[in-house]
Amino acid sequence: MKNIQKILPLYFVAGTQDCRHLGENLSENLLFVLKQALEGGITCFQFRDKGKFSLEHTPSAQKALAMSCRDLCREYGVPFIVDDNVDLALEIEADGIHVGQSDMPVQEIRAKTDKPLIIGWSVNRLDEAKIGENLAEIDYFGIGPIFPTQSKENPKPTLGMAFIQTLRNVGITKPLVAIGGVKLAHVKTLREFGADGVAVITAITHADNVQAATKALREASDEYAK
């Protein structure tokens, strides 16, 4: 059985759209940030490349970038997850896939491969968590958005940090990673409330010093585990 908790302490999510402020070469921007984040100590990376500022409409370039990100993650022994795109995840042999409530059902994903694919599931409501708790195909929940976020178009209602505590109090036992506007100052409380880790985008991609910011986030998350 996979030890999912070990990969969740600092879960980095990004695509080319999150690094466009760094210049015109979208692929190089993301690879630069990812390498610095890996040096800083991320424990997992989710390739989430979507939206009008991404490579979504140039599939060949997007696939090539995904493979480069995958290879970089493997150099550091960090799991590489693909967001939503199940076919891409399977084709390039990603370590996992993360899907939302309206994406391919997790039972179908699990049936597509006999490899030990990590499957994450986005949760925004208590009833969703209760349903997912009983689905053996799901390895962890992505809970959010915790705070307002600019990283998603039309984000769902914010939940607040106490929602993590609520999930634990009602008996949700699956590993949880909190996402959505999470910053360094929030990490300790989210971990205390029962999150197995935090997922961040701009806290890393927009940091003045990516490696240092990543290191601080990792240390804050690890501090709770001591």
Curated annotation (Swiss-Prot):
It comes from the Bacteria. 2-[(2R,5Z)-2-carboxy-4-methylthiazol-5(2H)-ylidene]ethyl phosphate binds at residues 149-151, 181, 201-202. One of its GO terms (cellular component) is cytoplasm. SUPFAM superfamilies: Thiamin phosphate synthase (SSF51391). Mg(2+) binds at residues 84, 103. Keywords: Magnesium, Metal-binding, Thiamine biosynthesis, Transferase. 4-amino-2-methyl-5-(diphosphooxymethyl)pyrimidine binds at residues 46-50, 83, 122, 152. Gene3D superfamilies: Aldolase class I. Its cofactor is Mg(2+). InterPro entries: Aldolase_TIM, ThiamineP_synth_sf, ThiamineP_synth_TenI, TMP_synthase. Disulfide bonds: none annotated. One of its GO terms (molecular function) is magnesium ion binding. Transmembrane segments: none annotated. It catalyses: 2-[(2R,5Z)-2-carboxy-4-methylthiazol-5(2H)-ylidene]ethyl phosphate + 4-amino-2-methyl-5-(diphosphooxymethyl)pyrimidine + 2 H(+) = thiamine phosphate + CO2 + diphosphate; 2-(2-carboxy-4-methylthiazol-5-yl)ethyl phosphate + 4-amino-2-methyl-5-(diphosphooxymethyl)pyrimidine + 2 H(+) = thiamine phosphate + CO2 + diphosphate; 4-methyl-5-(2-phosphooxyethyl)-thiazole + 4-amino-2-methyl-5-(diphosphooxymethyl)pyrimidine + H(+) = thiamine phosphate + diphosphate. CDD domains: TMP_TenI. Its EC number is 2.5.1.3. GO terms for biological process: thiamine biosynthetic process; thiamine diphosphate biosynthetic process. Condenses 4-methyl-5-(beta-hydroxyethyl)thiazole monophosphate (THZ-P) and 2-methyl-4-amino-5-hydroxymethyl pyrimidine pyrophosphate (HMP-PP) to form thiamine monophosphate (TMP). HAMAP family: TMP_synthase. PANTHER family: THIAMINE-PHOSPHATE PYROPHOSPHORYLASE, THIAMINE-PHOSPHATE SYNTHASE. This is Thiamine-phosphate synthase. It comes from Haemophilus influenzae (strain PittEE). The lineage of its organism: Bacteria, Pseudomonadati, Pseudomonadota, Gammaproteobacteria, Pasteurellales.
